[in-house]
Structure formats: C-alpha cells, structure tokens
C-alpha cells in the first residue's frame, strides 16, 4: 500500500506535482488545499478570510487533516497539502517538500489566480504567517523544520516538467527499493 505525501509552500508546485505523480503511479490524489478551499466556499469566505477563521476555530484544520490521515491509513494514495506530510508521516512511504523563493511563488500564484504580483505576495506572506502560528498552536509542528522529509526540492528555477521528473525519479527509486518491485 503506497502512500506518497507532497507538502510545500504556497506556489511551490505541490499540487501540480502531486497530480502528475498520482497519474503516473495510477493512484488517486487527495489535496488538503482543495478540501480547505471547499470548506472556505461552504462557509462563504475567500481563502485568506478562511485562514483567519481557521486560526480561531481549530476544528477546521482537524477536519482537513483527519481526511488526509484516513486516506493515508487506507493506503494507495498521493496526498498533497501544506501540512500533510507532518500529519501522515507514520504512514507515508515517501515525503517530499517543495519550496521556492517568495518572489517566484508570488509570480506563480499571480498567474494562477489572475491577481497582481503584489496581491499574491501579500497573500502568501499572510497565509504563511497564519499557517505557521496555527500549526504550532494546534499540533506543535514547526513548519520550518523539514527534517521529516525524504526530499526537499527548491523549484525556484526548475520547470514544472523538471520538478515532476526529479520528484518521480526519487519516488520511484524509493518505492522500488522499499518494495523490491518496479512501481514506475
């Protein structure tokens, strides 16, 4: 039962990489970010408002994280989310963390969301501040401590194809070695 967890900073490419990894491995992908966004919409809030709301209402994070944890326990899944790897580490075969410079991430988010660079940069900075505070308060997890990851990859100057290729090479090598079976 294969479990791959891909975490990272907003705009680092984690969702795109997770989607492609899931496709290649023929596994479903579960995105904590998508679950969080769906909850935000259900509550009638934009993403930043919902992050602030979640800061005061810890049950929001616990709902999202419990879904990821249950999927990890069941196995055969690629999980994606900012905090996901910390939550599912005991069940994950491979944990990857994607990062990039704040400027690169702001450019990516601005293009993806159709907002200005400055707006994207402000949102990233605020989300990261709120996430760091929330995760420390709820789970005592310091999201700056990347020691749980098998691979930390800076995507600042990598194309998405290169990021996917490097990630898949690492995942396939790890899974092939662990299970003595050709996964990829």
Curated annotation (Swiss-Prot):
Using the chain's own numbering, where are the disulfide bonds?
Answer: none
Extract one GO cellular component term from the record.
cytoplasm
Per the record, the coiled-coil ranges are none
Q: Which reaction does it catalyse?
A: CMP + ATP = CDP + ADP; dCMP + ATP = dCDP + ADP
Going by the entry's taxonomy, the superkingdom of the source organism is recorded as: Archaea
Question: By its UniProt entry, which InterPro entries does this protein fall under?
Answer: Cyt_kin_arch, Cytidylate_kinase_dom, P-loop_NTPase
Keyword line? ATP-binding, Cytoplasm, Kinase, Nucleotide-binding, Transferase
Indicate the family of this protein.
Belongs to the cytidylate kinase family. Type 2 subfamily.
Its protein name is Cytidylate kinase
